Curated annotation (Swiss-Prot):
Disulfide bonds: none annotated. GO terms for molecular function: mRNA binding; structural constituent of ribosome. Forms part of the ribosomal stalk which helps the ribosome interact with GTP-bound translation factors. Is thus essential for accurate translation. The keyword Ribosomal protein applies. This is Large ribosomal subunit protein bL12. It comes from Polaromonas naphthalenivorans (strain CJ2). HAMAP family: Ribosomal_bL12. The keyword ATP-binding does not apply. It comes from the Bacteria. One of its GO terms (biological process) is translation. Homodimer. Part of the ribosomal stalk of the 50S ribosomal subunit. Forms a multimeric L10(L12)X complex, where L10 forms an elongated spine to which 2 to 4 L12 dimers bind in a sequential fashion. Binds GTP-bound translation factors. GO terms for cellular component: cytosolic large ribosomal subunit.
């Protein structure tokens, strides 16, 4: 029996979410695999299926407000970005602004904590 990829995709396209869920469970049992372990490499490749939610891998650290300790926030911005004093002050004065762009989750969380410890309001996008 020849495999007809187009017919298979047509059948998948016509299935309901419940039917797709049952199919995934049957595949897991038949082949001894887990959909969770298959989802991680797919998310990294950028091609996740409709039933699999992609986890965000790049974050922007956005300075919303400097707060009362502006000098401490400027120092933190300088440490995080390597900017000069004037550039860091301009960035803080112009809030909301991106402090870091395209950072991985760990770096973004660390930057957020550092800025919040200095007294700033920060958001990850």
């Amino acid at each position: 029996m020849a495999f007809d990829k187009d017919a298979f995709l047509t059948v998948l396209d016509s299935m309901t979410v419940l039917e797709l869920n049952d199919l995934v469970k049957a595949i897991e049992e038949k082949f001894g695999v887990s959909a969770a372990s298959m989802a991680a490499p797919a998310a990294g490749g950028g091609g996740a299926g409709a039933a699999v939610a992609e986890e965000k891998t790049e974050f922007n650290v956005v300075l919303l407000e400097a707060g009362a300790q502006k000098v401490q926030v400027i120092k933190a911005v300088r440490e995080l970005t390597g900017l000069g004093l004037k550039e860091a002050k301009d960035l803080v004065d112009g809030a909301p602004k991106n402090v870091k762009e395209g950072a991985n989750k760990a770096d973004a969380e660390a930057a957020k904590k550092k800025l919040e410890d200095a007294g700033a309001k920060v958001e990850l996008k």
